[in-house]
């Protein structure tokens, strides 16, 4: 007689990316956070593995930690300079990002035709973690089949939300996620043709 197979819960860093939220990790208001040098940031309970994984929703603190410390979003370990890969980033000219409203976050001396790797809110991962990360990602994030090496230079762009102070009711800007933009040495002489229309 065959023994019943008891399903194992998903393992963080193996089946489920380290950076994702879990259903028991409720929002926790806004307050100072070391991930943004003490600035006000959106906060969230820290209970990885509690409840059900929410693969399409990054945990606020773990996301900021992953970008600031270059931690692999799959396993949560540091990525060395020679082992940083982006599965979801897109190459675009700096001028296109400026046209989308990210101009103040990019270095002033970065030419508009310089190609950057816009990684959004997903930090680079280890090459060895790529297959597991791809299996765990929602299909909508896998539109581009290419794995891209992450450039040696980058900038971090804080993304803000409006948070309400519980006592005064006043709204304050709070960092939600950190966007990561890698800076390449490539140029796109036709970058203006890729500007948003309208």
What is the predicted function of each stretch?
Residues 87-97, 141-150:
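Short cysteine/histidine-rich metal-coordination sites, predominantly Zn2+-binding motifs
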Residues 72-75, 126-129:
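Short cysteine-rich clusters marking metal-coordination/redox-active sites
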Residues 103-123:
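Short linker/helix segments within small regulatory modules
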Residues 47-54, 74-78, 82:
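Non-catalytic terminal/accessory regions
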Residues 65-71, 119-122:
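Short metal-coordination and nucleic-acid-contact micro-motifs, chiefly zinc-binding Cys/His arrays
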Residues 79-87, 133-139:
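Short Cys/His-rich "knuckle" micro-motifs
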Residues 1-69, 149-198:
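N-terminal alpha-helical interaction blocks
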């Amino acid at each position: 007689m065959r023994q019943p197979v008891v399903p194992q819960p998903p393992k963080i860093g193996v089946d489920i990316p380290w950076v994702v939220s879990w259903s028991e990790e409720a929002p926790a208001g806004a307050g100072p956070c070391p991930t943004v040098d003490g600035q006000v940031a959106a906060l969230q309970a820290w209970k990885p593995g509690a409840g059900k994984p929410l693969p399409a929703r990054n945990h606020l603190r773990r996301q900021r930690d992953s970008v600031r410390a270059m931690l692999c979003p799959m396993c949560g370990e540091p990525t060395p300079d020679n082992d940083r890969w982006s599965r979801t980033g897109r190459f675009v000219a700096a001028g296109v990002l400026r046209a989308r409203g990210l101009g103040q976050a990019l270095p002033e001396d970065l030419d508009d035709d310089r190609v950057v790797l816009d990684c959004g809110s997903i930090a680079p991962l280890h090459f060895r973690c790529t297959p597991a990360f791809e299996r765990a990602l929602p299909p909508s994030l896998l539109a581009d089949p290419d794995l891209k090496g992450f450039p040696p230079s980058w900038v971090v762009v804080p993304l803000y939300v409006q948070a309400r102070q519980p006592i005064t009711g006043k709204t304050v800007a709070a960092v939600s996620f950190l966007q990561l933009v890698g800076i390449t040495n490539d140029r796109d002489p036709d970058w203006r043709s890729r500007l948003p229309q309208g």
